[in-house]
Swiss-Prot record:
This is RxLR effector protein 207. Disruption phenotype: Exhibits significantly reduced virulence with smaller lesions on Nicotiana benthamiana infected leaves. The RxLR-dEER motif acts to carry the protein into the host cell cytoplasm through binding to cell surface phosphatidylinositol-3-phosphate. The disordered structure between residues 82 and 99 contributes to the effector function in cell death activation. It comes from Phytophthora capsici. Residues 82-99 are annotated as: Disordered.
Amino acid sequence: MSKVFLLLVLSVFALVSCDALSAPVGSKLSLSKTDELNAQPIDAKRMLRAQEEPTNAADEERGMTELANKFKAWAAAIKTWVTNSKLVQSMNNKLASLTQKGRVGQIEKLLKQDNVNVNVLYQNKVKPDELFLALKLDPKLKLIADAPAAWANNPGLSMFYQYATYYAKMTTKA
């Protein structure tokens, strides 16, 4: 398949190039009667702008800008199509959940150490939400985390509240 495509591209290139089918200089071709009135020498330049002085080749466009704009639009359309596809979104969600589970596992190992305090957690760049997940607290408790009555029933809740206030204080300082 690729050989056929390559052969097709090469043949189109040979037909389109300006010198592919030019007549040899000084050939003896007969002109028809209608062409005799407007006859030009065979070896004359055949370009539309042949009489103009040559300019900077970088200034000439020759259709490449249109092709480049079409290609950019096509690439942008494909990018949005791919990013909006359900497969890519599900893969991103799966990757995010796996990284979150890994991070929560690291925090759980950190919590099992004896000398864990809010400074150690902050130095390890633990976010309060990650700590909440690592402590395996009920999500409803997040609303009443500042109540000392709730701390008695949930021992990890007081640690979460202390760290959340410390984290808020440290992030507002920076």
